[in-house]
Amino acid sequence: MTQLSQSNVERVALVYISVYFFSCISLIVYFFTFCLSVSIPKNRQHPIKIIYNNKCPS
């Protein structure tokens, strides 16, 4: 009984941690793309293409 409740607590904690981690990553990506779109308003491309073009100006 106690072992089952312990595993349930660990599972709930793992779900909360994964949701919090995913929300933090999505928030960072959102702010990064927002800063890119503001800093480069004339280049309406995908953020990955913008990063690739900035790193490789060929």
Swiss-Prot record:
The chain crosses the membrane at residues 12-32. Keywords: Membrane, Transmembrane, Transmembrane helix. This is Uncharacterized protein YLL006W-A. GO terms for cellular component: membrane. It is a single-pass membrane protein. Its main location: membrane. It is found in: Membrane.
